[in-house]
Amino acid sequence: MKASMFLALAGLVLLFVVGYASESEEKEFPRELLSKIFAVDDFKGEERGCKGFGDSCTPGKNECCPNYACSSKHKWCKVLLGK
């Protein structure tokens, strides 16, 4: 009974997300959603002088903010995991 309720709730959440995505006219919905999920004080983008999550960067130039690293494969700032 608990599992079926959980699955029903998960299905409703998924339906809500898909419905919101289909109504969104912006083509950058996945990036917008990820930036809202992983937002870490992105309100001061120009003031801080570094690039936040998802911003394009050049590998080896240390342009990303602390706790972010420039991905050499995708060439955008991502969350730094580990040391």
From Swiss-Prot:
Query: What would be an example GO MF term here?
Result: ion channel inhibitor activity
Q: How does it assemble?
A: Monomer.
Domain writeup: The presence of a 'disulfide through disulfide knot' structurally defines this protein as a knottin.
Which tissues show it? Expressed by the venom gland.
Q: Which UniProt keywords apply?
A: Amidation, Disulfide bond, Ion channel impairing toxin, Knottin, Neurotoxin, Presynaptic neurotoxin, Secreted, Signal, Toxin, Voltage-gated sodium channel impairing toxin
The compartments listed are: Secreted
- Role noted for this protein: Lethal neurotoxin. Selectively blocks tetrodotoxin-sensitive voltage-gated sodium channels (Nav). Does not affect tetrodotoxin-resistant voltage-gated sodium channels or calcium channels.
Superkingdom in the source lineage: Eukaryota
Where does the signal peptide begin and end?
A: 1-21
Propeptide position ranges: 22-48
Specify the protein name.
Mu-theraphotoxin-Hhn2d
Q: Which family does it belong to?
A: Belongs to the neurotoxin 10 (Hwtx-1) family. 15 (Hntx-3) subfamily.
Disulphide-bridged cysteine pairs: C50-C65, C57-C70, C64-C77
Q: What are the top taxonomic ranks of the organism? A: Eukaryota, Metazoa, Ecdysozoa, Arthropoda, Chelicerata
Leucine amide occurs at L81
- Gene Ontology, cellular component aspect: extracellular region; host cell presynaptic membrane
